[in-house]
């Protein structure tokens, strides 16, 4: 598939899209019968696809130069970081890294960056954070805010690996993990509540801060109280702090919130709408006949599948627990992960067991829909059609869910369950919205999934992005 990049500059972003503001402050009822509150909040999608190639780059300052790089050496990275990059197996910058890294490292501009899932966004901003740090100053100099503990942990691990040859000390800053009162670590990675609360209380110093990153920014800015907290923090930050927002999608209703966070001058890197493509992911749906039959169909699927690992996404914690128990009773090796009620230690153990291959199936809510990179996952099952908090079809979460396969250009399979006309209509609404046709898989054809997955696994080769 061909790639090309279009650079344009303008004095202001003239594209004004219709926005539909959603209610992010709705209350959560009982734990089991509701969606996983920690992660089911954003509104409906703009329809921006994670898997397009072409980027649209715009700047608020037309006099600021635009350029990209083709090698990591061109960036003037510190030698110890360049060594860390190559130790990670990166030979050359990916598309988003080519465009974003010069802005992060060499430009004074703030950054809003959108690119498809699995293209190296994390490596882009972690390199930028590490490169701005002065190791001789024992104080926070770069902060990354992630929406979930699992994503924060993954980012912490990437930073630790890329920075392994430096004297930079990263710190995982989340609840239930003890942190020092006087933080001397230069790079902080954590969740919104923990970081924002302690910055406001001045328990986390921002005196030497140079860079703030919001990962999965479209979700974070719509979390309860976060925009107000960020506005308060902006008044505490040094004037020269660079703010970088990254996401694979941008939901409707976030533009005004983003403008409160990212000040001029800024550069915006977005997917071109006409470049929508999800051809690397084979997408199917199966009519289970009734809601009760969904568990039986799932059992049949895992009776045939013998290759790789998979993630099963459900809508509520109660469903997650029920599906998990049924699969355990049938003798499957299964992990269970959701946001509420599980301790941080339990959550990290579940994701580690799955990443280490101790379990082959992970049952989860949308808490794991964004950002998590598990290369051996070749199948995603939407046990429940993804819905927003209003019960409407949610293309954004659909994209993020199926984005757990097809990482870094690999192939994968996404299978969605429907069981009546209403669930079918909701899934078809997502399909139409994204312009992506879904093939029907008959229950009599379930056995063919194993052959499809084996073919995909045989195609996998190590990728250097």
UniProtKB/Swiss-Prot annotation:
* Organism of this sequence: Dictyostelium discoideum
Biological process terms in GO annotation:
poly(A)+ mRNA export from nucleus; positive regulation of gene expression; sorocarp development
The EC number(s) given in the record are 3.6.4.13
Query: Which gene is this protein's source?
Result: helC
Any idea which positions bind ATP?
Answer: 115-122
Q: Where is the composition biased (Basic and acidic residues)?
A: 1-20
The catalytic activity, as recorded, is: ATP + H2O = ADP + phosphate + H(+)
**A single GO molecular function, which one?**
mRNA binding
Q: Where is the composition biased (Low complexity)?
A: 21-34
Motif placement: DEAD box: 215-218
What SUPFAM superfamilies does its record include?
P-loop containing nucleoside triphosphate hydrolases (SSF52540)
Q: Which GO terms describe its cellular component?
A: cytoplasmic stress granule; nucleus
User: PANTHER family in the record, alphabetically?
Assistant: ATP-DEPENDENT RNA HELICASE DBP3
Please state what the protein is called: ATP-dependent RNA helicase ddx19
Write the record's keywords in alphabetical order, separated by commas.
ATP-binding, Developmental protein, Helicase, Hydrolase, Nucleotide-binding, RNA-binding
What is the similarity comment for this entry? Belongs to the DEAD box helicase family. DDX19/DBP5 subfamily.
**Cross-referenced Pfam families:** DEAD, Helicase_C
The source's domain of life comes to: Eukaryota
């Amino acid at each position: 598939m061909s790639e090309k990049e279009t650079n344009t500059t303008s004095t202001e972003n003239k594209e004004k899209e219709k926005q539909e503001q959603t209610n992010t402050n709705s209350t959560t009822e009982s734990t089991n019968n509701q969606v996983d509150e920690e992660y089911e909040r954003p509104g409906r999608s703009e329809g921006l696809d994670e898997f397009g190639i072409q980027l649209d780059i715009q700047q608020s300052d037309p006099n600021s130069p635009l350029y990209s790089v083709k090698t990591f050496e061109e960036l003037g990275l510190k030698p110890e970081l360049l060594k860390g990059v190559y130790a990670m197996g990166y030979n050359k910058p990916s598309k988003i890294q080519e465009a974003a890294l010069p802005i992060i490292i060499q430009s004074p501009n703030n950054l809003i960056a959108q690119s498809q899932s699995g293209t190296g966004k994390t490596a882009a901003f972690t390199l930028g954070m590490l490169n701005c740090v002065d190791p001789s100053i024992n104080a926070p100099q770069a902060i990354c805010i992630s929406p979930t503990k699992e994503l924060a942990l993954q980012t912490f691990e990437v930073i630790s690996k890329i920075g392994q040859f430096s004297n930079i000390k990263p710190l995982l800053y989340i609840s239930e993990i003890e942190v020092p009162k006087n933080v001397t670590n230069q790079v902080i990675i954590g969740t919104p509540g923990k970081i924002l609360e302690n910055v406001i209380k001045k328990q986390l110093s921002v005196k030497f801060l140079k860079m703030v990153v919001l990962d999965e920014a479209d979700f974070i800015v719509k979390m309860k109280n976060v925009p107000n907290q960020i506005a308060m923090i902006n008044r505490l930050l040094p004037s020269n702090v660079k703010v970088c927002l990254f996401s694979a999608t941008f939901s409707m209703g976030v533009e005004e919130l983003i403008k409160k966070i990212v000040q001029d001058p800024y550069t915006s890197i977005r997917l071109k709408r006409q470049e929508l493509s999800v051809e690397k992911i084979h997408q199917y749906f199966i009519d289970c006949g009734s809601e009760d039959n969904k568990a039986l169909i799932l059992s049949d699927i895992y009776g045939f599948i013998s290759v790789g690992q998979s993630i099963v996404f459900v809508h509520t914690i109660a469903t997650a627990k029920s599906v998990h128990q049924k699969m355990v009773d049938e003798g499957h090796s299964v992990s269970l992960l959701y946001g509420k009620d599980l301790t941080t230690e339990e959550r990290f153990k579940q994701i580690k067991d799955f990443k280490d291959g101790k379990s082959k199936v992970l049952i989860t809510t949308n808490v794991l829909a964004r950002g998590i990179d598990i290369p051996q996952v070749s199948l995603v099952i939407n046990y429940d059609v993804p819905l927003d908090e209003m019960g409407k079809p949610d293309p954004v979460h659909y994209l993020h869910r199926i984005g757990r396969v097809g990482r870094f250009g690999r192939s994968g399979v996404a299978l969605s369950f429907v069981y009546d006309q209403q669930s079918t209509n909701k899934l078809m609404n997502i399909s139409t919205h994204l312009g992506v046709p879904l093939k029907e898989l008959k229950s009599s054809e379930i056995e063919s999934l194993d052959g499809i997955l084996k073919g995909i696994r045989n195609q996998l080769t190590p990728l250097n992005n």
